[in-house]
Swiss-Prot record:
One Gene Ontology molecular-function label: calcium ion binding
UniProtKB keywords: Acetylation, Calcium, Endoplasmic reticulum, Lipid droplet, Membrane, Metal-binding, Microsome, Oxidoreductase
Motif (Proline-knot): 116-125
Chief location category: other
Gene Ontology biological-process annotations: negative regulation of lipid storage
Function: Calcium-binding peroxygenase involved in the degradation of storage lipid in oil bodies.
Protein's name in the database: Peroxygenase
E.C. numbers: 1.11.2.3
Domain EF-hand: 60-95
Homology family: Belongs to the caleosin family.
Amino acid sequence: MGSTSDPSPSIITVAAEAPVTAERKQNLHLQEQLAKPYVARALAAVDPAHPNGTEGHEHHNMSVLQQRAAFFDRNNDGIVYPWETYQGFRAVGFGVLTSILGGFLINLGLSYRSQPSWIPSPVLSIHIKNIHRCKHGSDTESYDTEGRFEPSKFDAIFSKYALTQPDALTSEEISTMLQVNRNLLDFIGWVASIAEWRLLYQIGKDEDGLLHKETIRGAFDGSLFERLEKDRASRTKIV
């Protein structure tokens, strides 16, 4: 007869016949660190260090995914055009060529799914109210299919892949995560995830080549982009 102190098989997170479950760990104490981490948050990208989301960041009653997309809505009309995506890329520090490609490819890929009708947009507009339809596969699942933020999925990025530092990812760790997250035959999702994470790494890594948890969290709700734009504007004024 087993000891009463032995954990129930129903909550054990490692299976001996599946070594990968030991390699990619879960945070067994997340519920002690953050209230109801299993509940997807509609308005705030939360973690144990930010239980109320990003301080000073306005949600405007948008989902977390909508908040991210709204940064690129430069005239706040609820629609993102390719030239606005370009402007958003430039605002956070990307070069002209990357911004042109981003403006075209992102809007090309997301426009139709976000349209309010079956008629395509000739100018590749993206409607923010329908941005949840544009969620691709092979991702971290930190957004759910309605655009809410999943705290437990976000935390798993670091419990599973942050082996060098607990709250940051190296370039190699990002590559591992991207490979692991690939869904079978989901070529579009593979490419989209690689592009998103490599672009984020380019603008968000520190001098040691680490992409920190706070930087990544800010990318999910768009607050990182707002901060980068303000920092660039401040430097321009000084010059």
